[in-house]
Amino acid sequence: MRQSQLLLPTLREAPSEAESVSHRLMLRAGLIRQLAAGIYTYLPTGRRVLRKLEAIIREEMDHAGCQEVFMPAMQPADLWRQSGRYEKYGPELMRLKDRHDREFALGPTHEEVITDLVRGEINSYRQLPVTLYQIQTKFRDEKRPRYGLLRGREFMMKDAYSFDADWDGLHASYQRMYDAYHRIFSRCGLHFRPVEADAGTIGGEGGTHEFMALADIGEDTIAACDRCQYAANLEKAGYRIPEGDIRSTGDSAAYPEPAKIHTPNVRKIDELVQALGASADKMLKTLLFLADGKPVAVIVRGDHEVNEIKLAGLLQADKLELADQETTESLTGAAIGFAGPIGLSVPVILDYSAAAIGSVIAGANVTDYHWKNVRPGVHFEITMLGDVRNAAIGDGCPNCAEGKLRMSRGIEVGQVFKLGTKYSEAMQANYLDAAGSEKPVIMGCYGIGISRVMSAVVEQHHDEQGIRWPLELAPYQVHVVPVSAKDGLQMDIAGKLYGDLKSAGFEVLLDDRDERPGVKFKDSDLIGVPIRIVVGRQAADGVVELRYRNRGEAQLVSTEEALALVRGYFGS
């Protein structure tokens, strides 16, 4: 491609609203342009990268025995009602009506559509197993789109769905896709890690893993063991819990009786630490929640945070929300910040870590007062004991006896789920087994955020000058840059190199613009083509410069050697 004919509007400075490195560089390199919040146009160079991503995914999906389909983005609301997700999904689901007042949704996922397809086409065990996939635009009405393609309202996704006759078949399908994801992300040049995760709104009873691209900008926190292979999203991560009854024990006489202390306007844990000189791990934090509309008190240590996903799972609640100020003050009889476990008339859920403390400080359910010397299970009744907090740095690993948890940030680029019969039972997607009995198909689903992968790659592969594309994703493989468009000899040699490289099967960009050399070189570094061949003053002697973008190295070679070196670099 001749650069003079290419729509490649590079920018010297990124727009001020671009927060992440990938967003800034993708705007500056002319890959994308914003149409509205969370909605982007892919310009020609960005589209080339996207197509290469899609090609890798298609190749690996085909290798894994999957078959490609293409499903509608607009889905009847009735299908979502059949699965039970229409109301549960929440405001992120984009809903609309046609002129006949029929309800539809713009698909964030396609579990309902694919299940509807399969229940109409598959009715025998002889037709199983089968795995179908598509590459399709998805929609999600994000409350706060940000970071460019990392959190958008319209995005590209690969979603696959497996259908098996039994759980053994699902386990095999899941492993096959898990392995395919390893190959895909490795080929994309990502530094990634699969982690245990929560199934979220997609659900299913068989477990799930997220594939996390490690990056400081990531919105997810990963808890990983420093000794074993355990890793989990913070939403899911556990911690080592002592065996047996971990509640504090011992002679009550050894502990002072609870005493009420005056703490005027001291509402937060850090304020309480400062006022009393006690450490946060010797305090209880009491929060009121509504679980399916019913109030519960949740208690964690003062230095810990409630994990609402774990809490909802423990309570088996479809809807969980923090109680508002009016509800909290009505239940406790005190202002916000003074809630405590003693005397509450609602169920009390206590985290394991909070149960193990001998004597603590807690809210008194009286404005401007706290209790000291409170003992969990002695001075208040525990309705339920469980893991309802976020794991923290230094917690014991739940998977091994010696490891400690450490935290890092990650970008979720893919997720695999064992759905089981969640959708097939709800939507009656059944088949006849060898004995003629009707059974629900066993499902799995597997997603990759393609546009998010593109951003994650840029987050990991860049320097101060611009993007450094991995070889399989680079929009072009070679960038031929004559220093002066006015120098006929340089242009002739550059043109011949361009033609020879194209004939050899390489994707080549020729910078034939009449621009200053500095502008050309900055643009070349910015867009990140792996090899740049500079045709300059030494062209008259048959010498050009080969510069390797990812290595930061350069060498002078003859024009005859250039093609051979390019071949060797790309392994062709």
Please report, for each region that a protein language model flagged, where it lies by residue:
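NTP/phosphate- and nucleic-acid-binding module
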Residues: 1-572
